[in-house]
């Protein structure tokens, strides 16, 4: 009888251990970079960053640069990262978007004032069910799991608007117009292989001779 009880206890222990291991989060690693810094997503869902940090892009609560990878604060179970703007962005496994950093100033760098709050990841509660984000300077796009695309200004991230006329989108990409830091354009790929573009059309960025609509 004692052996039977011990056997049951051991079997139960093994099952519980298996369940714990099965629930351990795992995601596909990725890296995103711009001219100043890099974000790396590990398979365990943590985010690591290195490079210039004067705008808080590393997400460590300070403006201290880092020669070596440091872990971004407060993020777990992340599935996507984006480092294209001075604002860094990430998407977690629940589909929420996180952002941190400060917009690049047109004034001299020595006048930049960065708070710990700006340099620490914050969640955007106005949108969820997101699977991918992209940014180019001030503006950002979020692709939801239902194939719709949403836009927001990084200065007011809780004011999220749906991009009309798009559905069944599988990939999004934003670009900055060469020679004008305030002009942007966006592209989207739908499930049928069609490419959609909008925004500024300087130098025919949208692949058409027609004027675009500024973001």
Feature names for model-found ranges:
Residues 3-8:
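Sec-dependent signal peptide recognition
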Residues 81, 178-181:
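Short glycine-/Asp-/Thr-/Trp-enriched loop segments that recur within the blades
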Residues 15-27:
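Sec-dependent signal peptide cleavage junction
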Residues 27-41:
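Beta-strand-rich domains and repeat architectures in extracellular enzymes and scaffolds
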Residues 41, 48-68, 98-124, 150-164, ...:
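Short glycine/serine- and acidic-residue-enriched loop/turn motifs that recur at repeat junctions
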Residues 37-40, 49, 87-90, 99, ...:
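Conserved core positions of repeat-based scaffolds
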Residues 34-35, 43, 52-54, 84-86, ...:
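Short loop/turn segments that connect beta-strands within the blades of beta-propeller domains
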């Amino acid at each position: 009888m004692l052996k039977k009880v011990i056997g049951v206890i051991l079997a139960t222990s093994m099952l519980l251990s298996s369940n714990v291991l099965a629930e351990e989060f795992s995601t596909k690693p990725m890296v995103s970079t711009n001219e100043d810094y890099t974000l790396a997503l590990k398979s365990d869902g943590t985010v690591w960053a290195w490079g210039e940090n004067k705008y808080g892009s590393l997400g460590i609560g300070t403006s201290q640069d880092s020669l070596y990878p440091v872990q971004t604060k407060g993020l777990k179970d992340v599935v996507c990262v984006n480092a294209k703007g001075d604002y860094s962005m990430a998407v977690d496994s629940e589909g929420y978007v996180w952002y941190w950093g400060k917009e690049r100033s047109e004034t001299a760098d020595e006048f930049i004032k960065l708070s710990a709050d700006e340099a620490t990841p914050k969640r955007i509660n106005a949108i969820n069910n997101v699977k991918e984000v992209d940014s180019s300077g001030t503006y950002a796009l979020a692709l939801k799991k239902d194939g719709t695309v949403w836009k927001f200004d990084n200065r007011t991230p809780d004011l999220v608007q749906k991009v009309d006329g798009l559905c069944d989108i599988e990939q999004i990409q934003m670009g900055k117009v060469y020679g004008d830091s305030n002009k942007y354009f966006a592209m989207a790929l739908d499930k049928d292989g069609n490419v959609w573009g909008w925004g500024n059309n300087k130098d025919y960025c949208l692949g058409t001779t027609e004027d675009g609509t500024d973001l």
